[in-house]
Amino acid sequence: MKTLLLLLLVLLELGEAQGSLHRVPLRRHPSLKKKLRARSQLSEFWKSHNLDMIQFTESCSMDQSAKEPLINYLDMEYFGTISIGSPPQNFTVIFDTGSSNLWVPSVYCTSPACKTHSRFQPSQSSTYSQPGQSFSIQYGTGSLSGIIGADQVSVEGLTVVGQQFGESVTEPGQTFVDAEFDGILGLGYPSLAVGGVTPVFDNMMAQNLVDLPMFSVYMSSNPEGGAGSELIFGGYDHSHFSGSLNWVPVTKQAYWQIALDNIQVGGTVMFCSEGCQAIVDTGTSLITGPSDKIKQLQNAIGAAPVDGEYAVECANLNVMPDVTFTINGVPYTLSPTAYTLLDFVDGMQFCSSGFQGLDIHPPAGPLWILGDVFIRQFYSVFDRGNNRVGLAPAVP
């Protein structure tokens, strides 16, 4: 009888997970930082943006100006494709759980970054309309601004009608010029959306395009294009993780924010001994935390400043400590190979730390951000129906 009951529970969970799954392939490209480093331009980039990544801090606030740390996108490697309009115009985007707006470059944008990317042409779409509202997103090096348009947005067979989105007319700095992506599709809660725009996933749910009010993310560790990486709308795929999902309640419905019990380095609690807050963020490449804490963490793993960032000796990976995030009573351990980014410069190995200081001040912070370095190791499910995040060890 007990065996039958367990089987029924497993079947129920499988049914909940599957529904009708809509899979969005995520392609992995070399990050902007890797490209700049390969061209020996990384130091010049830091200087031109007045950035010292060793001391980097940035004040973030959750007001209508929606401050975003631009530096988060430097290491982004996973991108997908969407289309806007009739007939469809294709764009490469970051699917970002740390923001809630969709924006792409406008054909009317004259910033250098727009000239190197796909631009939306409203006059070419028969389903386009313009509400007439402006928008602005503040980044560390300036503001991205433009107008809000409305059109149908398609993502791998899911077509949202009447989706409002930003058409950028100005884009800040040099960062977006060399970026692999055209725009960003935010998957955060509506409270984060600039201009009161309804996010894409909320419209998917409202228009009954997904069977289940959840989506999931698998980021392959395969450096050759990240084969198999995908975003799933409407459920999750058991083949992408081992064991069972551990569900963690969302503590604040803006980012996908959860509570951390503690953070251990080498088996010893070093941070958050009385708990702290974190967000699971597909739009941040590294793991970030308060700058003073991250400095201690870099010292603990043996990372040292090199050319404006923290690096470790590649030969020391086998003796460096594990870093463990305890969440809802469950330990999530990152080995040194998991939290270290490997690159090649002039044929030589270069290993940089996957941790970055970022100060997010009240009322939004302080926050730790569990970005792609974490998500590559732990399959992540974002459940809007129950306001929770599911985590389990990812299958390589």
UniProtKB/Swiss-Prot annotation:
Organs and tissues of expression: Expressed abundantly in the stomach, the Clara cells of the lung and activated B-lymphocytes, and at lower levels in lymph nodes, skin and spleen. Not expressed in resting B-lymphocytes.
Recorded consequence of changing C60A: Abolishes homodimerization
The EC number(s) this enzyme carries: 3.4.23.34
Signal peptide interval: 1-19
Key word Oxidoreductase present: no
Intrachain S-S bonds: C109-C114, C272-C276, C314-C351
GO cellular component terms, semicolon-separated: endosome; intracellular membrane-bounded organelle
UniProt subcellular location: Endosome
Classification via Pfam families: A1_Propeptide, Asp
Keywords: Aspartyl protease, Autocatalytic cleavage, Disulfide bond, Endosome, Glycoprotein, Hydrolase, Protease, Signal, Zymogen
Propeptide span(s): 20-53
Residues bearing carbohydrate: N90
Gene Ontology molecular function: aspartic-type endopeptidase activity; identical protein binding; peptidase activity
Domain of life: Eukaryota
Catalytic residue list: D96, D281
Catalytic activity: Similar to cathepsin D, but slightly broader specificity
Post-translational modification: Glycosylated. The nature of the carbohydrate chain varies between cell types. In fibroblasts, the proenzyme contains a high mannose-type oligosaccharide, while the mature enzyme contains a complex-type oligosaccharide. In erythrocyte membranes, both the proenzyme and mature enzyme contain a complex-type oligosaccharide. Two forms are produced by autocatalytic cleavage, form I begins at Ile-54, form II begins at Thr-57.
Residue ranges constituting the Peptidase A1 domain according to the UniProt record: 78-396
Keyword Glycoprotein set for record: yes
GO biological process: antigen processing and presentation of exogenous peptide antigen via MHC class II; proteolysis
Family assignment from sequence similarity: Belongs to the peptidase A1 family.
Subunit structure: Homodimer; disulfide-linked.
Chain's role: May have a role in immune function. Probably involved in the processing of antigenic peptides during MHC class II-mediated antigen presentation. May play a role in activation-induced lymphocyte depletion in the thymus, and in neuronal degeneration and glial cell activation in the brain.
Protein name: Cathepsin E
Protein's organism: Homo sapiens
